[in-house]
Amino acid sequence: MEPCLEIRSLSAVLPNGQRVLRSVSLTVQPGEVRALVGESGAGKTMIGKAVLGVLPKSVRIVEGEMLIEGESLGRLDAKARRTLIGARTALIPQDPLTALNPSRRIGPQTTDRLVRILGWSGEKADERIRQLLQEVQIREPERVLKCYPHELSGGMRQRVLIAAAFAAEPRLIVADEPTTALDVTVQKQILRLIAQLQRNHGTALLFVTHDLGVVAKISQKVSVLYAGKVVEEAATADLFASPQHPYTRALIAATPRYTDPYASLMPVNETVLAGLADEIAGADRAWRPSHG
């Protein structure tokens, strides 16, 4: 069976030549949840944007290949690439408070993609969105579809965005830190909801996060990113049981422990900005935290 997503030696640079992604390779199998974890600036979101074809104009891919179900995105013209990405992938964005257009009702915003990209009738798209809103535990879907975003809470807006992502039965969903902007109680509900829908629909999930607690709850495989490079890759249970790279060990050690409320957080020291890693020979291998 073809991987849902395969990235082969992908590198990307800024206009000044600094590399933001360095020979990134990973695969996501059908129905698999793979987490991308690392601190801010590690390149997690950049990988997700590359897959979805929405890299900033200032970022240029200089080598490597991305394949969705065996089809190479780089070998397609722009229109065919947009069609493939639109039909087989979807995004759950980071901030539900800014992801929706404040001047449009929820209904048209969530059905647009189904009508324009997939060619569904308006009636079919409306029915599908109503069904998904019920799946994400929104009790009054008809009322919500008529609402403007400001009339809904942050948690409700994120549920709407999750419903929209799953509506077209994509093969792959990129979840870009989808709980970061929510309070802790709502975060748990949203994580549980994403995991449930992922299992029910059999959708592959590329889950971008800096939170190892989230990684432990939702993923089967993990890719650890440091300075734009995958420095460790493992099954989730194996990664926590026996982390191999010093950066991975430092991330795990820096996770807050609640056994001692007065304990200080362990810093992750001596980090390297992704763009500077090329200038420091062996930065991804030589990095060491000050503890452990």
Locations of the language-model features?
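Short catalytic/signature loops enriched in Gly
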Residues: 3, 139, 143, 235-292
